[in-house]
């Protein structure tokens, strides 16, 4: 069946831009709709469709890669341990390098998607670093990676050192000592960078002792003696750390040591005897002579001393007591105020019955050698029954002469709510009295204490 549609000539509908509707026109509404259905008014319809096609055909170009530098480009006074990286958005890195002013490439690593490049080693002080490389966008076009920054120039760098050797085996009372070569104004920042890990875990804490002539010092000790066999690891992240007043740490340090057998010396002044005690019990019990105590400088100090040195031969001097360069055998130093446990045949008649020394603990030559061969750095020597307490005035290690609450109050970090107020201990070590024995660091000098 053929359907014929007849059209009468019609006039085009003029465009009416006014808001008034047209009530009548050359064709009826029905006819207009019929005409639209058969494409009579196609030119108008095509114009509208063409507009949509044009919009679909318009494609925005992909965004160019965006670079983010950390620290920002041209930054100055950057701390050399700060996180250093460059990140690209809307792209990925082809290659990236950071070089110092001497042209050395700094170690770094890409993220898995190659959108982040992170520096993996510390930087140097007072150095300009330059970024180079390229990143590729989604359009395949490369853009350069270019930037620079400068690290801080310290007013000075501060060095530090441990008193123990790495891998050393020590006694159950050995503290960890870090000696700095300069005073430190921001001790809290330094203390936060120090960690001690023990196996098995033991409770312990840092304390800042009075500064010595060479600089600040901080000690760590356990609350109680270490269990025998404990391993200790110390990590000091000091490089790049601000110490205050424009000073920075010179290097990181680490230390591993272990605690040996448990050995304690029991030294009761009024008994005129000395005992060496291990887990096996009393292994030595010797007659001895302690400080005469006629003068304060001749009093063997009360409290827990720590073995720090020992010499098979040692030359002692004590001008205040009237002698110098006296050869003694089997000398074990227990404090830096001149106290030793050593052989002294001259006091043999008093050993076991009276105290006649200048403060040292005298033994017979045979007994002194036997004790000497058993002693190691860090062994505690517990002196009781004396009239003067071991204190900060007596040298470098008096860590066990204070109670635990006093010890933790000497930390530079903010105290917990229950922590006691800081004990009033001098900021700097006291001046050695003129009549005190002269400490000695070597066994063959004339600058040794006598006793």
UniProtKB/Swiss-Prot annotation:
Pathway: Cell wall biogenesis; peptidoglycan biosynthesis. The keyword Repeat does not apply. Keywords: Acyltransferase, Cell shape, Cell wall biogenesis/degradation, Peptidoglycan synthesis, Transferase. CDD domains: LDT_IgD_like_1 (cd13431), LDT_IgD_like_2 (cd13432), YkuD_like (cd16913). The keyword Cell wall biogenesis/degradation applies. SUPFAM superfamilies: L,D-transpeptidase catalytic domain-like. In contrast to other LDT paralogs, LdtMt5 is not inactivated by the beta-lactam carbapenems; beta-lactam carbapenems form covalent adducts with other LDT paralogs but the formation of covalent adducts was not detected for LdtMt5. Residues 417-451 are annotated as: Disordered. Pfam families: Big_10, YkuD. The active site is at residues 342, 360. GO terms for biological process: cell wall organization; peptidoglycan-protein cross-linking; regulation of cell shape. GO terms for cellular component: extracellular region. Residues 437-451 have a biased composition (Low complexity). GO terms for molecular function: acyltransferase activity; peptidoglycan L,D-transpeptidase activity. Its EC number is 2.3.2.-. Residues 263-384 form the L,D-TPase catalytic domain. Generates 3->3 cross-links in peptidoglycan, catalyzing the cleavage of the mDap(3)-D-Ala(4) bond of a tetrapeptide donor stem and the formation of a bond between the carbonyl of mDap(3) of the donor stem and the side chain of mDap(3) of the acceptor stem. Is specific for donor substrates containing a stem tetrapeptide since it cannot use pentapeptide stems. This is L,D-transpeptidase 5. It comes from Mycobacterium tuberculosis (strain ATCC 25618 / H37Rv). The gene is lprQ.
């Amino acid at each position: 069946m053929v359907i014929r549609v007849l059209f009468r000539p019609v006039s085009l509908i003029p465009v009416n831009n006014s808001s008034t509707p047209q009530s009548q026109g050359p064709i009826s509404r029905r006819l207009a709709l019929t005409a639209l259905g058969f494409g009579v008014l196609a030119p108008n319809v095509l114009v509208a469709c063409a507009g949509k096609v044009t919009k679909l055909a318009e494609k925005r170009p992909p965004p160019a890669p965006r670079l983010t530098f950390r620290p920002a480009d041209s930054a100055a006074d950057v701390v050399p341990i700060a996180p250093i990286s460059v990140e690209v958005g809307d792209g990925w890195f082809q290659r990236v390098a950071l070089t110092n002013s001497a042209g050395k490439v700094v170690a770094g690593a890409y993220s898995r998607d190659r959108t982040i490049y992170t520096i993996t080693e510390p930087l140097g002080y007072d150095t300009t670093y330059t970024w180079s490389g390229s990143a590729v966008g989604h359009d395949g076009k490369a853009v350069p990676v270019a930037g620079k920054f400068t690290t801080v120039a310290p007013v000075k760098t501060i060095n530090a050192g441990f008193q123990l050797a790495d891998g050393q085996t020590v006694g159950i009372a050995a503290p960890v000592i870090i000696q700095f070569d300069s005073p430190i104004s921001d001790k809290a920042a330094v203390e936060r960078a120090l960690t001690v890990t023990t196996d098995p875990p033991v409770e312990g804490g840092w304390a800042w002792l009075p500064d010595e002539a060479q600089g600040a010092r901080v000690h760590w000790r356990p609350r109680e003696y270490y269990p025998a066999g404990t391993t200790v690891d110390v990590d000091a992240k000091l490089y790049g750390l601000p110490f205050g007043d424009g000073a920075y740490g010179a290097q990181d340090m680490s230390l591993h040591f272990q605690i040996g057998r448990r050995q304690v010396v029991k030294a009761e002044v009024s008994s005129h005897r000395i005992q060496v005690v291990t887990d096996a019990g009393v292994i030595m019990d010797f007659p001895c002579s302690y400080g005469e105590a006629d003068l304060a400088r001749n009093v063997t100090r009360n409290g827990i001393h720590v073995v720090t040195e020992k010499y098979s031969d040692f030359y002692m001097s004590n001008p205040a007591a009237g002698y110098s360069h006296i050869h003694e055998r089997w000398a074990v130093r227990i404090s830096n105020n001149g106290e030793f446990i050593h052989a002294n045949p001259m006091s043999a008649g008093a050993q076991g019955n009276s105290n006649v020394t200048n403060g040292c603990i005298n033994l017979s030559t045979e007994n002194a050698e036997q004790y000497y061969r058993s002693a190691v750095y860090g062994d505690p020597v517990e002196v009781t029954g004396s009239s003067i307490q071991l204190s900060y005035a007596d040298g470098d290690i008096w860590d066990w002469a204070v109670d635990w609450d006093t010890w933790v109050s000497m930390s530079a970090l903010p105290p917990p709510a229950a922590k006691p107020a800081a004990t009033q201990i001098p900021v700097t070590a006291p001046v050695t009295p003129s009549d005190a024995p002269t400490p000695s660091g070597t066994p063959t000098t004339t600058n040794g204490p006598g006793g």
